[in-house]
Amino acid sequence: DAIVKQNNDGILYLFKKNKVTFFHGRGAFNKAVEGGYEIQVTGKNAETLVAKQVIVATGSNARPLPGVEFDEQQILSNDGALAVNAVPKKLGVIGSGVIGLEMGSVWRRLGADVTVLEGMPTFLAAVDEQVAKEAKKAFDKQGLKIELGVKIGDIKKSKKGVTVAYTNA
């Protein structure tokens, strides 16, 4: 929690330093107007504003697998993975999207043996092919194990940990 707070405070400091106004809530672009865009911000401090330049921070939410619930003890979301107090010996990450790769990379650099399981047959399929190739090389160099084209089977919890059964499609 302290690390996340420190990062958030650092971002808010950079906003202030660069004269960026921060609005917390959900935003919707209503229409283009003279001087920029009309934006409706909903939430605790709802308001409509006009801005010439806008940064949209989309946040992130982990997508659960059908029949698998995040208990934040053994089966972790990205939020739970950031709250772990000790480096796990082994860690399995399901999905090689931005969140999965970030979590896997962080824990690998901290010493965990990390395997990333991806259902797609290609690495970072939505990204430019050359960028994906270079990213794959960087992750391989870190020691991140990436399995592509896998089908996730049973996920079982026990006192010793979690077992993820998977097959190569």
Cite the ranges covered by each PLM segment.
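FAD-binding core/adjacent interface of flavoenzyme oxidoreductases
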Residues: 5-94, 165-169
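A non-catalytic, amphipathic alpha-helix used as a structural packing/dimerization or gating element
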Residues: 2-13, 134-141
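N-terminal Rossmann-fold NAD(P) dinucleotide-binding loop
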Residues: 100-101
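Glycine-rich Rossmann-fold phosphate-binding loop(s) that bind the pyrophosphate
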Residues: 94-97, 127
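A Rossmann-like FAD-binding core segment of flavoenzymes
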Residues: 21-24, 28-41, 110-169
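Charge-dense, low-complexity intrinsically disordered segments
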Residues: 1-2, 126
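Short hydrophobic alpha-helical segments of the AMP-binding
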Residues: 107
